């Protein structure tokens, strides 16, 4: 309820791309009330709000790996859109599982490491285009672009990282360029999963994490969905609404 605390949290989110609140009310009403104080929630095919929990036990096969206990590699959400959501917020309502730690990687650091140490891979990642596809139960979304998408070649920001699971990304380029494109994608994954560039933490009920979805890659460790409960509520907000 304190505007100064909210401003400080949002200032950190803009500056660093990642910010956390602790000990917030672990209720379904809290997240939408808070985010709507900032701006309109960005609706997607998941709705305005979505709940991340393992569904295999009670709803049959999950239509997204997020709804399982599988490990999720570092990625950004919805590169299948012309403009992926600017910010993502995840609010922990319950967590009694072993494992499932959250992992965050600053994409600016990844891009800088690639530019300095692997310039050929960086060039391929910023120029060669991929097609990104997501097929849900009743709809499909597709967009194309480079993995590292700068608004201007000379500026680190604005930046859109289109980091997606390889099974949902397909080369949209001359076949002669595909070997170096896949080699660069493997290099990108190696750097994004380097422990030096990751922050790891375990969600506790009441934790609320906000991060820049076009800059920060997120993932999680595996957990056993039948041994406890892990429930996160999430939503998106566009950059120009903050």
Map each language-model feature to its residues.
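Active-site environment of non-heme Fe oxygenases that use a 2-His-1-carboxylate facial triad
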Residues: 1-18, 23-24, 28-242
């Amino acid at each position: 309820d304190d505007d100064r605390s909210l401003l400080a949290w949002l200032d950190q989110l803009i500056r660093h791309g990642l910010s956390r609140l602790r000990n917030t009310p672990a209720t379904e009403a809290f997240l939408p009330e808070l985010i709507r104080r900032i701006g309109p929630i960005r609706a997607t095919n998941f709705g305005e709000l979505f709940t991340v929990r393992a569904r295999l036990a009670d709803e049959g096969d999950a239509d997204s790996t997020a709804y399982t206990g599988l490990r999720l590699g570092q990625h950004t959400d919805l590169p299948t859109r012309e403009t992926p959501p600017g910010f993502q917020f995840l609010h922990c309502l319950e967590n009694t599982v072993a494992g499932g730690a959250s992992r965050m990687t600053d994409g600016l650091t990844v891009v800088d490491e690639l530019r300095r140490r692997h310039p050929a891979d960086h060039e391929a990642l910023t120029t060669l285009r991929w097609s990104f596809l997501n097929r849900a139960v009743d709809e499909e979304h597709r967009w194309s672009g480079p993995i590292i998408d700068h608004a201007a070649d000379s500026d680190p920001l604005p930046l859109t990282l289109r980091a997606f699971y390889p099974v949902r990304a397909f080369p949209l380029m001359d076949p002669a360029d595909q070997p170096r494109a896949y080699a660069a994608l493997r290099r990108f994954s190696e750097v994004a999963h380097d422990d030096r560039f990751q922050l790891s933490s375990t969600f506790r009920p009441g934790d609320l994490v906000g991060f820049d979805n076009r800059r920060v890659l997120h993932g999680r460790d595996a957990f056993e969905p039948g041994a406890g409960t892990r429930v996160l509520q999430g939503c998106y907000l566009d950059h120009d609404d903050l």
